Amino acid sequence: METNIKTVHYLGSKARMLPVIKEYVDELNSVNGKVCDLFCGSGVVSEFLLQQYDILAVDIQNYSSVYCKARLTGGIPGIDIKQIESEIRNLPIRKKNLDYYKALLRYENKCMKDLVDGYLEPMYEIIEKGSLYAYLGKYDYIEGAMSSELEEAFTDVKNRIGTEAESVDSAVTRYYGGLYFSFKQAIDIDAIAAYAFLQDEPLKSCLLYTSPSPRDA
């Protein structure tokens, strides 16, 4: 399994300084004792030092805990990636969201085809005005009118999701679909997250760690 996966790019990342950091740690830790990585963030320093030292990675942020559990566990023996992918694809939550959002998915697919043909405006509108969260909340977030095609797709989704407009099952799709990810990608990310929270560690953290976040888009 690929282990060199970068899912977050920190401002001030220490990734390029790892050999120098290790030199100083070696100098200060001549007895080869345990190393505590305070404010470990994405865990790149802990992962690098783990080659030689016993590491205690510490951070107050929960996302950091997820990253480090995934990076520092050393992999999961016997994992069947194809089976996991199949289970995620067939997850009831994913099928439900594909049904709820099908009008929007059709329209987005049409816009992508237009983009390939050199017609940029429809896709540009999705990126600029395609916030389903803002549409459902009736927030005044756009300049000018929304096209009838996009509004019809949004209206169809609104009617389909009904009382599930705030469901955690589609949180990524509502907040980030269209703006950061395509709506299809966002639905898949929601499915991966839902599947991950059904798993035990370390698989849970590994799945969450490898899921894209808006800052990676």
Where are these regions (language model features)?
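Conserved phosphoryl-transfer catalytic core
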Residues: 71-145, 162-164, 168, 175
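Nucleotide donor/acceptor-binding cores
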Residues: 33
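Conserved Class I S-adenosyl-L-methionine-dependent methyltransferase catalytic core
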Residues: 174-175, 179-183, 189, 205-208
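S-adenosyl-L-methionine
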Residues: 1-29
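Mobile cap/lid helix-loop segments that border enzyme active or cofactor-binding sites
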Residues: 188-194
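SAM cofactor-binding core of SAM-dependent methyltransferases
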Residues: 36, 42-88, 92, 162, ...
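Structural motif
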Residues: 196-206
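Single conserved hydrophobic/aromatic residue that forms the stacking wall/gate
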Residues: 209-217
